[in-house]
Amino acid sequence: MIEGVMKEGFITTSYDSVVNWAKTGSLWPMTFGLACCAVEMMHAAAARYDIGRFGAEVFRASPRQSDLMIVAGTLCNKMAPALRKVYDQMSEPRWVISMGSCANGGGYYHYSYSVVRGCDRIVPVDVYVPGCPPTAEALIYGIIQLQQKIRRTHTIARV
């Protein structure tokens, strides 16, 4: 592809490829840190790992400014409506990463009366990051997997 650009001065591609490339390079995450996994999420954003290299530069505090929610930690029954409300306020297209055993399926507190057994019962999840707590490398790998999923989606519906 590079040789074609150097010789001809242009490349040909599809609209889907360009839009999906732009989406993968500008993920704006919103924190939904609920427990100890949030510490690893902050660790991934710090200087050593710097998820800004992967397009997730700044964690947003407002759901209207973000398109990626990282649910990190134990989701209790009282917090579940707030999670859904914040998810509904996010702009389209929106994605969710479930980070840690507790967010994935209840984890250590799976049999507790007050714990939701997986945030996928409340919001649709795109990528699951396992671990208790998962490392910063695992979260970065999850972001890379989400970027690959975004690249495979179709923006324009073919009729």
UniProtKB/Swiss-Prot annotation:
Entry's Gene Ontology cellular component terms: plasma membrane; respiratory chain complex I
Cofactor note: Binds 1 [4Fe-4S] cluster.
Protein's cellular compartments: Cell inner membrane
Catalysis performed (reactions): a quinone + NADH + 5 H(+)(in) = a quinol + NAD(+) + 4 H(+)(out)
Location, primary (coarse class): membrane
Known EC number: 7.1.1.-
Gene Ontology biological process: aerobic respiration; electron transport coupled proton transport
Gene3D superfamilies linked to this entry: 3.40.50.12280
Source species, domain of life: Bacteria
Oligomer status and interactors: NDH-1 is composed of 14 different subunits. Subunits NuoB, C, D, E, F, and G constitute the peripheral sector of the complex.
UniProt-recorded name of the protein: NADH-quinone oxidoreductase subunit B
Gene (name only): nuoB
